[in-house]
């Protein structure tokens, strides 16, 4: 039976440590501030944004939400981002994805100042991450790595298999694991013999957005299984990309859904916001 990697518990511990750090910064006259921009009325996006606001409040990070109509023009959104870039009281800027169809997502991401890009999506920060330089790491991969480290799970020489190749999770977590001296294999929708490959994984990371796509048949005995998927069942409950009940019989460690990777993603956003505030104000990190 697998040991749970409980992201909810770990995130609460980390937030308490961050609160102490934020209080110390406030004593120096610096309050980290995050601006979240939400375009449209996507219920899932609204829920995520609420979670971010709540987490900011717990740690003492200041935050504000700019809510914009679905039909706002791209130029208007770019103007708002520019204003936030030039506001010295704002340290982190997050544009909640996905954006409406009339928006060029890449152009919007590129418009955020790299120094305030707390999502870690700007190409300058992605490039720095790739070369191992100090930068903002995308929040979900950062959360996964933090969870693995919290249990002293050795990555060196281990075979990590990633199912999914998105810019938000799949690609960056592979780079981070490579920097930890893991051997990394990417798999995706065009991969042949997927099961054959995943059964070689010491660490299996699943990020495909399809409920229960992976079960115990895909998992090597005693593998570490990280389930990034968040899917809503017919009864409204959340479930992951991994069939938890079968997988936990085979894995050594496994993340649940919910209370796994999700809470860690928000917590790493807070960590990046504190980092941004320090960097913009020349405070020692």
From Swiss-Prot:
Flavoprotein found in the keyword field: no
Matches recorded under Pfam families: THF_DHG_CYH (PF00763), THF_DHG_CYH_C (PF02882)
GO-annotated cellular components: cytosol
Domain of life: Bacteria
Residues that bind NADP(+): 164-166, 189, 230
Pathway membership: One-carbon metabolism; tetrahydrofolate interconversion
Catalysis: reaction(s): (6R)-5,10-methylene-5,6,7,8-tetrahydrofolate + NADP(+) = (6R)-5,10-methenyltetrahydrofolate + NADPH; (6R)-5,10-methenyltetrahydrofolate + H2O = (6R)-10-formyltetrahydrofolate + H(+)
Any one Gene Ontology molecular-function term assigned to this protein's record: methylenetetrahydrofolate dehydrogenase (NADP+) activity
UniProt KW keywords: Amino-acid biosynthesis, Histidine biosynthesis, Hydrolase, Methionine biosynthesis, Multifunctional enzyme, NADP, One-carbon metabolism, Oxidoreductase, Purine biosynthesis
InterPro entries linked to this entry: Aminoacid_DH-like_N_sf, NAD(P)-bd_dom_sf, THF_DH/CycHdrlase, THF_DH/CycHdrlase_cat_dom, THF_DH/CycHdrlase_NAD-bd_dom
Gene Ontology BP, a term: methionine biosynthetic process
EC nos: 1.5.1.5, 3.5.4.9
Subunit structure: Homodimer.
Family: Belongs to the tetrahydrofolate dehydrogenase/cyclohydrolase family.
Role of this protein: Catalyzes the oxidation of 5,10-methylenetetrahydrofolate to 5,10-methenyltetrahydrofolate and then the hydrolysis of 5,10-methenyltetrahydrofolate to 10-formyltetrahydrofolate.
Protein name per Swiss-Prot or TrEMBL: Bifunctional protein FolD
UniProt source species: Oceanobacillus iheyensis (strain DSM 14371 / CIP 107618 / JCM 11309 / KCTC 3954 / HTE831)
